[in-house]
Regions:
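Charged (often Lys/Glu-rich) extended helix/loop segments that serve as interaction or gating elements
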Residues: 245, 257-385
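Flexible loop/turn segments at secondary-structure boundaries
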Residues: 61-64, 86, 149-150, 189-193, ...
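A charged N-terminal "starter" segment
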Residues: 1-138, 175, 179, 213, ...
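Short acidic, glycine/serine/threonine-rich loops at helix termini
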Residues: 66, 89, 109-114, 131-134, ...
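Active-site-proximal loop/turn and secondary-structure-junction residues that shape catalytic pockets
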Residues: 36, 59-61, 82, 103-104, ...
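Active-site loop/helix belt of alpha/beta enzymes
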Residues: 146-283, 348, 374
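Structural preference for beta-strand elements that scaffold enzyme active sites
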Residues: 52-54, 73-75, 94-98, 119, ...
Length: 385
């Protein structure tokens, strides 16, 4: 039965569990709930019937995540040799893969092709010349530029052929002896309004009709991802309800056309399954303002704040104590970079060094973009179930 409760950012561990885990593994620590990951994947699969689900490895390519999804029968979207190798290590096979990077190095393309990957994406004629030389028997999807009013991040500002170029690009592929099989688009990251898919799908149907009329039969449509996850102070509709609207748009637009549909969700699959456990390692008063320094910051798991415009929820154990006075505080990361500041004017009660801070919904675009700046270790990840 579908729940109609709003989705909120919730931790996969309690503070008692977090303390126990930190005593064994130290912090910062990313904690994966495999059962939550499986639940998210199954919700997407079950509410997009007839749509092939290719998990976007770029969101989180950790072995624990990939192995769990492979065991559930997922397929996978890769963009590089390393992502392909990680997929192989997790048990995926080439027929379960699609390579969706529109701009590939010759090494990236040829190595993935030589290892059996056959589905690729392109968005310009120069990219087609690489396929002629290095991957001539590939099955190609043309990436088309599409945007959404409610997406947090426009993913068509860098990639995607304009719709009015689509027929010319498909024709160019045919002239070069290549095999264009369909279209792809990405509506943008963290798309909050599922009805935005309706406009994009109607546009894609028009392009497919145009191609068919020109003698280029297209048999695949990749609708990308963009399905959202709940972050700080957000209440989103249940994912099942969101996907039901997307599926209704698909049925309305393509119900009369025999076409293979696929999607590439990343954030919606993995975000809510992981919580970061961090510790306060420093405290100071600067011009009357409380500063708290965590053992993880913008160069670690919080790196997702930069590319995804993501505002993570922070939970402290004292938050539930109604008699606690709260202060507008600065929350900073551990590095020497003065820009490594997570929040300003963040309301917190008086905190002490050693106390834990939980950051839920940390599964997507966090570990994936972390680095060891200043020699600070990237948070390790463990699974709790």
């Amino acid at each position: 039965m579908t729940s109609h409760q709003p989705r909120r950012s919730e931790s996969v561990v309690s503070f008692a569990e977090a303390r126990d885990l930190v005593s064994k593994h130290r912090s910062p620590l990313l904690v994966l709930s495999r059962s939550k990951l499986a639940q998210s994947y199954r919700t997407i699969r079950d509410h997009l019937p007839g749509v092939g689900i290719y998990y976007a490895a770029k969101a989180n390519a950790h072995a624990l995540v990939l192995e769990t999804l492979q065991s559930l029968g997922a397929s996978i979207d890769v963009c590089s040799i390393k992502e392909m190798q990680g997929a192989f290590d997790a048990g995926f096979i080439p027929s379960q893969m699609i390579h969706t990077h529109p701009c590939k190095t010759e090494s990236n393309l040829s190595t993935c092709y030589e290892n059996g990957v056959r589905w690729f994406v392109f968005d310009n004629e120069f990219e087609l010349d690489k396929f002629v030389t290095f991957a001539p028997e590939s099955n190609l999807l043309l990436r088309v530029s599409m945007t959404s009013r409610s997406s947090a991040l426009n993913l068509s500002s860098k990639f995607g052929a304009s719709p009015n170029q689509s027929l010319a690009m498909l024709s160019a592929a045919r002239r070069k002896g290549l095999r264009p099989h369909g279209l792809s688009f990405h509506i943008g990251s963290q798309c909050l309004d599922p009805s935005d898919f309706g406009h994009a799908l109607r546009s894609m149907r028009g392009l497919i009709n145009e191609a068919i009329a020109a003698g280029i039969p297209l048999e695949v449509l990749d609708i990308g991802g963009g399905f959202p996850a709940p972050y700080r102070d957000q209440e989103l509709m249940p994912m099942a309800d969101y996907l039901d609207i997307v599926h209704a748009c698909l049925t309305e637009t393509f119900g009369d056309l025999p076409i293979r549909l696929i999607a590439e969700p990343g954030r919606a699959v993995c975000a809510e399954s992981i919580t970061l456990i961090s510790s306060i390692v420093g405290k100071s008063f600067r011009e009357g303002t409380r500063w708290y320094f965590l053992d993880d910051g913008l160069y670690g798991a919080f790196s997702g704040k930069r590319p995804g415009h993501t505002d993570y929820q922070l939970l402290v154990e004292r938050q539930g104590q109604l008699d606690q006075e709260r202060f507008d505080c600065v929350i900073a990361g551990p590095t020497c970079d003065s820009g490594d500041v997570l929040y300003r004017d963040f309301p917190l009660p008086e905190m002490e060094i050693g106390e834990l801070v939980l950051a839920p919904t940390m599964g997507a675009y966090s570990l994936a973009s972390a680095c060891e700046f200043n020699g600070m270790a990237i948070p390790q990840m463990i699974a709790i179930d």
